[in-house]
Every structure is written in C-alpha cells, then in structure tokens.
Design a protein with these regions (language model features):
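Metal-dependent de-N-acetylase/amidase catalytic core
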Residues: 1-152
Length: 152
C-alpha cells in the first residue's frame, strides 16, 4: 500500500513513499501494490455542496475565503485521482470519529481551524466516510468499484 503517484495532494514525502514502494514491489518480483488516493470528484462535489450551503446561510462553519481556497486546491490535477480511475471504495463510516481524531492529531499537516476539521460531523462523514484505492495492475475500465482490497 503506497500513495498514488501525486502523493494524494502533491506532498513531496508522499510522492517519495510512492516511488520507493513501487520500486520495492518491482524489485521483490512484482508484489501487488495498491495506491491510496483521494476521490477528486467526490471532494469537488463536497466543496460545491459547502459553497451552496454557505450561500444559503446553512454552512456557518465555513467562510468564503476558505471555500475558495479549497476549490482551487481541488482543481489541481495532482489532487487525488478522478473517480473513473479509482478501483476500490471502502466504507469507513463505522470508524469515522477515529479517522477525524487521526487527522486532528497531525497538527503539522492540518491546522486546528482547517476546512476539514471545521465540518460538522455529518458533513465530515459524507465527505470522508470512504477510503479510495487504485489497483494499477487492473484498470477499472467502467467496472463498479470493489469494496474488497484483498480479493478484487
């Protein structure tokens, strides 16, 4: 398991993890590798929903500047991968509070007042309740995303 080629969102350490992991897998005789990614299309949709909620006065947790910054970052091609490229989608809503706590614990990566941590619980779960993966050895080619990382 390594990050996608862009490191999820262009993070240089994550890009290096991808390079080293893929190289190791190849040197070890072609060990299967899965890439952890973010669903660029799902994140963009979540931002669009937040913009609409903010405009209607519902998203009191967000502000216009924050939303515009998020939108700009999600438009970059090095941010995650397109839904059509993602081969696996695993529901993690059963552990969503632990996921949020883990993100919060990475203070060097995510500020306490970040867009992600400011979301209400329901919005956070809808946005981050799925973990996304790519099996680079098996392009999706229109198939439904699998929810089983080991067998499919």
């Amino acid at each position: 398991m390594v990050y996608d080629p862009s490191g999820g969102y262009g993070h240089p350490d994550h890009i290096q993890v991808h390079r080293v992991g893929v190289r190791w897998a190849s040197a070890a005789g072609g060990v299967p590798v899965r890439w952890v990614t973010m669903n660029r299309d799902a994140i963009r949709s979540a931002i669009d929903r937040a913009v609409d909620e903010f405009a209607s006065g519902e998203a009191t947790w967000a502000d216009e500047e924050m939303l515009e910054l998020r939108r700009q970052r999600a438009e970059v091609d090095t941010f995650g991968m397109a839904d059509a490229e993602i081969t696996h989608a695993v529901d993690v809503t059963a552990v969503i509070s632990r996921k949020r706590d883990a993100i919060r614990a990475h203070a060097s990566q995510v500020a306490a007042d970040s867009f992600f941590l400011a979301m209400p619980d329901e919005t956070f779960a809808a946005t981050f309740g799925t973990e996304w993966f790519v099996d680079p050895g098996r392009p999706r080619n229109g198939r439904t995303q699998s929810d089983d990382l080991l067998l499919a």
